[in-house]
């Protein structure tokens, strides 16, 4: 399940995404996530809601995304702030919902 909220100022948006990919956000899916986030000017942060004390990390950093250790079934909070925040969250939501391009 995916939920998306856009703030009233339209310069901020967030989504809670459930990762269904069998490998979670391991190397290839994480790289696709970072590549997608990096297309946008907005500051994009991610945090694993399924793990206690998960840090909020830069979603444009492969090391940051790997640090949150997202496994299959985990819920990921993604927040964007900037002029293209809504578009960024939409693209990341589509990537996760599309299982990172995998048919499995």
Describe the residue ranges of each PLM region.
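Long, contiguous binding/interaction regions
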Residues: 2-10, 31, 35, 89-91, ...
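A detector of low-complexity, intrinsically disordered, Ser/Thr/Gly/Pro/Ala-rich segments
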Residues: 1-2, 16
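Intrinsic-disorder/low-complexity, polar/charged segments enriched in Ser/Thr/Lys/Arg/Asp/Glu/Gln
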Residues: 12-16, 75
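N-terminal cationic amphipathic segment used for targeting or macromolecule association
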Residues: 4-10, 44, 78, 83
């Amino acid at each position: 399940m995916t939920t998306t909220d856009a703030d009233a100022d339209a310069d901020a948006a967030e989504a809670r995404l459930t990762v269904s990919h069998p490998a979670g956000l391991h190397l290839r899916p994480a790289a696709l996530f970072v590549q997608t986030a990096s297309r946008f000017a907005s500051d994009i942060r991610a945090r694993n809601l399924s793990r206690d004390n998960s840090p909020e990390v830069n979603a444009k950093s492969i090391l940051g995304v790997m640090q949150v250790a997202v496994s299959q079934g985990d819920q990921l909070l993604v927040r964007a702030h900037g002029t293209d925040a809504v578009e960024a969250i939409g693209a990341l939501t589509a990537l996760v919902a599309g299982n990172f391009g995998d048919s499995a």
